[in-house]
UniProtKB/Swiss-Prot annotation:
GO terms for biological process: L-arginine biosynthetic process. It is found in: Cytoplasm. InterPro entries: AGPR_AS, AGPR_type-2, NAD(P)-bd_dom_sf, NAGSA_dehydrogenase, Semialdehyde_DH_NAD-bd. It catalyses: N-acetyl-L-glutamate 5-semialdehyde + phosphate + NADP(+) = N-acetyl-L-glutamyl 5-phosphate + NADPH + H(+). SUPFAM superfamilies: Glyceraldehyde-3-phosphate dehydrogenase-like, C-terminal domain, NAD(P)-binding Rossmann-fold domains. This is N-acetyl-gamma-glutamyl-phosphate reductase. Gene3D superfamilies: Dihydrodipicolinate Reductase, domain 2, NAD(P)-binding Rossmann-like Domain. GO terms for molecular function: N-acetyl-gamma-glutamyl-phosphate reductase activity; NAD binding. SMART domains: Semialdhyde_dh (SM00859). Catalyzes the NADPH-dependent reduction of N-acetyl-5-glutamyl phosphate to yield N-acetyl-L-glutamate 5-semialdehyde. It comes from Deinococcus geothermalis (strain DSM 11300 / CIP 105573 / AG-3a). The keyword Amino-acid biosynthesis applies. Its EC number is 1.2.1.38.
Length: 321
């Protein structure tokens, strides 16, 4: 049997490079590559987009939309790693663990949108709790994200590593202070919320690794931190890549969180922290923004689309690889 053909449009970018690295050596897939000299040639791209069984788009939003328009072969399926289609009608949301229906929706879909990194951390915490009725969908929420500099793309990586300049380069920067960020609609739609949360992202001087935090006033909700933890643990029970960390005596075992702990993996850890008087809770997710937040999730989604998820691939990559 001929292995499925995969074309990564944008394989020279941060996410594209890591997707390709995670797929290298896979004998059950065939990777199609564009001649580097023709990387910006629309006809060369069109040819490969239509020759692939799955086209993976690692492009800016406008270019991703153009790439979708180039695909005329009805048999070509699309996995879009941009934010162009994450709330678009007709596109499956590529988070297999998010709901009981998610895997089948991804498996059956022709068009799949890979989640954003910050949004992955947020909706992983929110969706099980809104579905369980523990968080009302109209609850005003604040979300904070802390990412390594690779979350800013190739230009920011090069600036941090001495190959260019970028206004976001430095040990720690807050941004999107207009209070508008492209992940907010995704957080609302797939987190089960009626309104976008107030979201403030921050980028630090480490290469990769991310924390996403959501504070809650439990006294206003009429729920306990233990109930929140139980709902998350029940929802993700048995999942290979999403772990709800133990909750004993009102706290996880780890009082200090390093955003880099899961680097190189496709794993996602969820924590519930509780204040001593039971009035407050802090929901936290930890992931590699280039792993479960981007390329690891993309390779997992490829396998779900192709019915290969049960093959046991780890989707791991060495840190910084």
């Amino acid at each position: 049997m001929t292995p499925p053909r995969i074309f990564i449009d944008g394989e020279a970018g941060t996410t594209g490079l890591q997707i390709r690295a995670r797929l290298e050596g896979r004998e059950d897939l065939e990777l199609l590559s564009i001649d580097p000299a023709r990387r910006k040639d629309p006809e060369a791209r069109r040819e490969l987009l239509n020759a692939a069984d799955i086209a993976v788009l690692c492009l800016h939003d406008d270019v991703a939309r153009e790439a979708v328009a180039m695909i005329e072969n009805p048999a070509t399926r699309v996995l879009d790693a941009s934010s162009a289609h994450r709330t678009a009608q007709g596109w499956a949301y590529g988070f297999p663990e998010l709901t009981k229906q998610s895997r089948e929706e991804i498996r059956a879909a022709r068009l799949v949108s890979n989640p954003g990194c910050y949004a992955t951390g947020a909706v992983a915490l929110l969706r099980p709790l809104t579905d369980a009725g523990l968080l009302p969908p109209d609850l005003p929420l604040s979300v904070q994200g802390f990412s390594g500099y690779s979350g800013g793309g190739r230009a920011l990586v090069e600036a941090h590593e001495g190959r260019g300049e970028h206004p976001m380069a430095g040990p720690f920067k807050s941004y999107a202070l207009s209070l508008i960020h492209k992940h907010q609609p995704e957080m609302a739609r797939h987190g089960g919320l009626k309104h976008a949360p107030l979201f403030t992202p921050h980028v630090g001087g480490w290469r990769q690794g991310m924390l996403v935090q959501i504070p809650l006033h439990l006294g206003l909700l009429g729920v306990t931190a233990a109930q929140l933890h139980e709902a998350l643990a029940d929802h993700y029970a048995g999942e290979r890549f999403v772990r709800v960390m133990p909750f004993e005596h009102g706290q996880p075992a780890d009082p200090i969180l390093d955003p880099q702990t899961l680097n190189g993996t496709n794993e996602l850890e969820l924590f519930v922290y509780a204040g001593p008087n039971g009035e407050h809770a802090l929901l936290v997710s930890r992931l590699d923004n280039l792993g479960k937040g981007a390329s690891g999730a993309a390779v997992q989604n490829l396998d779900v689309m192709l019915g290969l998820e049960g093959a046991g691939h780890s989707y791991r990559l060495a840190e910084g690889g």
